[in-house]
Curated annotation (Swiss-Prot):
It is found in: Cytoplasm; Cell membrane. It comes from the Eukaryota. This is Protein unc-13 homolog. The keyword Ligase does not apply. The gene is PATROL1. It is a peripheral membrane protein. One of its GO terms (cellular component) is plasmodesma. The lineage of its organism: Eukaryota, Viridiplantae, Streptophyta, Embryophyta, Tracheophyta.
Amino acid sequence: MEEENAVEILQRYRRDRRKLLDFMLAGSLIKKVIMPPGAVTLDDVDLDQVSVDYVINCAKKGGMLELAEAIRDYHDHIGLPYMNSVGTADEFFLATIPESSGSPPKRAPPPIPVLISSSSPMVTNPEWCESPSAPPLMRSESFDSPKAQELTVDDIDDFEDDDDLDEVGNFRISRRTANDAADLVPRLPSFATGITDDDLRETAFEILLACAGASGGLIVPSKEKKKEKSRSRLIKKLGRKSESVSQSQSSSGLVSLLEMMRGQMEISEAMDIRTRQGLLNALAGKVGKRMDSLLVPLELLCCVSRTEFSDKKAYLRWQKRQLNMLAEGLINNPVVGFGESGRKATDLKSLLLRIEESESLPSSAGEVQRAECLKSLREVAISLAERPARGDLTGEVCHWADGYHLNVRLYEKLLLCVFDILNDGKLTEEVEEILELLKSTWRVLGITETIHYTCYAWVLFRQYVITSERGLLRHAIQQLKKIPLKEQRGPQERLHLKTLKCRVDNEEISFLESFLSPIRSWADKQLGDYHLHFAEGSLVMEDTVTVAMITWRLLLEESDRAMHSNSSDREQIESYVLSSIKNTFTRMSLAIDRSDRNNEHHLALLAEETKKLMKKDSTIFMPILSQRHPQAIAFSASLIHKLYGNKLKPFLDGAEHLTEDAVSVFPAADSLEQYLLELMTSVCGEDTSGPYFKKLIPYEVESLSGTLVLRWINSQLGRILSWVERAYKQEHWDPISPQQRYGSSIVEVFRIVEETVDQFFALKVPMRSIELSALFRGIDNAFQVYTNHVMEKLASKDDLVPPVPVLTRYKKETAIKVFVKKELFDSKHLDERRSINIDVPATAMLCVQLNTLHYAVSQLSKLEDSMWLRWIAKKPREKIVIRKSMVEKSKSFNQKESFEGSRKDINAALDRICEFTGTKIIFCDLREPFIENLYKPNVSQSRLEGLIEALDTELGQLCSVIMEPLRDRIVTSLLQASLDGLLRVLLDGGASRVFHPSESKLLEEDVEVLKEFFISGGDGLPRGVVENQVARVRLVVKLHGYETRELIDDLRSRSSLEMQQGGKGKLGADTQTLVRVLCHRNDSEASQFLKKQYKIPRSHG
């Protein structure tokens, strides 16, 4: 709010000031007003720079008012602070700025220091700082040093301008290390006269003064002003501040602006004064003539004497520059063609040479020749310079500096004033005022808006390259955006720009191409290796891309090929990506080849570094480039894929085994490819039929790696099988320990299998599901082989069962061996012991085998789960494939692999060994008490209860060795064998066993005893299982309880077909069972029936 009030007060002050001046100048208070040089009316004078006090004093005196002196008086007093004239001694000037000095010290001021001779030591009293009675300091006394050591204005005046400028230049260099901008030069031909940048700079300043003089701002500074300016520059260099300097810098007046620009352009004050005085002298007597319409070099040659130079060498150098400028502006680079004026151009060249030759003549003759030549030169030069161009009126503009390309080179030097002399990376605070002032030179230099924006953008951009200040780059972009396209330009400007052409290296180049093509080339060079030049991907890269795109469009439109070009921003971005990726990849590859790789293959390191490169590219650079090319990431990824693929292919072609190099390179290459594909799909989607995917040649690392892994698996599986053979041959079927009641061979087999599995998953190479499936099948086969070895020497349980006795009917005589009906009984009878030599293992050995196989099947399940978990961890996600055929190949492994084959074989082996063990115990170990002597001579004298103790002994031996999970399984087999033995006794007990219906009750009791033995009060087998098994014996026991007549009637009621098919009768038994029951009856009715019906022979009497 206070700032707004201050602005309003300032505006009101300026309005009131102008009204006061208008009143005094328009009225009769001033007798005569003398205009400053270059001004015709008061409208040409900036009243804000006229001293009101000077005008009031002239009005009081009643004298003439010289506005030039009023302007000088205004600038001479502007640096002094305001004070009212009350005459009090308490008024003083502040030597510092209060706002920047901070708060006043809270301590008491120190006492007045005592000046002592240098030979005596200085004694200080520390109590002075705390003494309240210390006298206050006088305002004129200093804390720093005696007055004899201070610099006075006269001392400052002794500094030469050139020395000051050198010091300032050195200070600038010390603050900033300039970048090399040697490549960034406009594509313009050199000048025929050999004029230098210094010549252009000095002439540009002369033009600026002439144009400023047209607005009445040209005055010659006084001696006092010179001293004040020198003092201000020294204070700046010393880093000190003063109120007067601050106010001078904030001045927006034309005079101070020109003074500031003089320093910016490194023009000495002596030259400035010479030029100002010369221009003022040239304009004297030319009533109504504007200073900017003068032919400046000619007028200065005429009005500036050699006596104004410190030495003749400086004068000759100055004169040579003026003559060269006339030659360049009127002959070499004229804005208007000569036509019929060609002779005048020749005369002009001759006169210029004669003026230069006059300096070598004696003084009198030289002066005469120079004066004559200057007179003739004026006639010829003025006639050439005032030829009309672009429809202007004769005399309106003096065409001597607006010829291309001289004009743009001069304007470029003027534009350099916008940079701060002490910080060339910043624009000066007066940049807007400078640009506004430079517009006054447009008429003289023939500058249009398009030329201005182009040159200004060039100057800003080149300064950015030198200083690396991003702010300058942003300003340059703003100016580039202001350059109008062809259709946005007016017809006159379009026609004018079309004529601005020059030849460089036998190539015709337009104005825009001269300035924009170097910018474009520089931007292309930077972006063509953006990984190197924009290491951190700063915002500068985004601005550089903007510069490249703007200049590319402008140059494309300027070129004749613009109408036929189909190039776009996308193609430009792709060219940058292509170049930068190639350069970076090449550097990276060379660096890896030259580095110490610690025995790691260079392709593996290259893949890792390439992945890092792509991560940096996608996160830092691509967000910038994607603004103009949405699929730039896909292009970059496809390019990197190709570059690395070219390096990888020879290695893949030569890979035949899983060597250390292969194990190092394969995963790195596959990981890189998958990362690149993920980046591409993130931009292009899941559809892999896009243009960038089509160009990809897949590495197929996984396929090659899988093939090599399969070879390794096959070799390992052969090793496992040989180890299985070896382990089995060394197996003695002794328990390892009471806790580990299985054979040592299975432990060895699992050890080698697990080692192989560990090695498989330790292979850090890409794999497919096919390789895992092959490993599963190989291990499955190994355990099937092991199981077959266990079972190969185990006999059939039927070999343990003794031959079934011949069926005979009851009679007290020797049984005769006969054949029964063919349709009922087999013709082959075994009445002798089988001759097969059977190796019957011990029960403990069979139990160890059972435990071993159970351990195998249980560990297989754990191994299976472990392998799948490790596989899932190894392959956490579905891979992206480039070709659909690869997807189809992978579909062959859909279901989850397992050890189903070996598991099935082991379970079958467990069942067989259990059955064998039960049969062995009943029919071998308990054969005599069970099979041969049970129920002999009758049921009551040999009951089953007598066998329970022997069964319990066998059962205890089983349970002491067998593992807990197998207990019920083996006991169930023993129950089945016991029931088989009991049926054998009841149905095939031989001629010595007879059963009466009255004994069925005893038999039922025996069956119940056997059942309860295996149930064991709940500690044995489940009751339901035992009941189901005992059911078949109960039926036979029940048949033994029927009367003979009932059995015979049931047999007679059946047809022959039913008998052949084994159908059951009303008693629930088949024919064979009923016949066998009748064979064990000791009554004549059964014997007669069996003799008549089945021809069964009689037994021994």
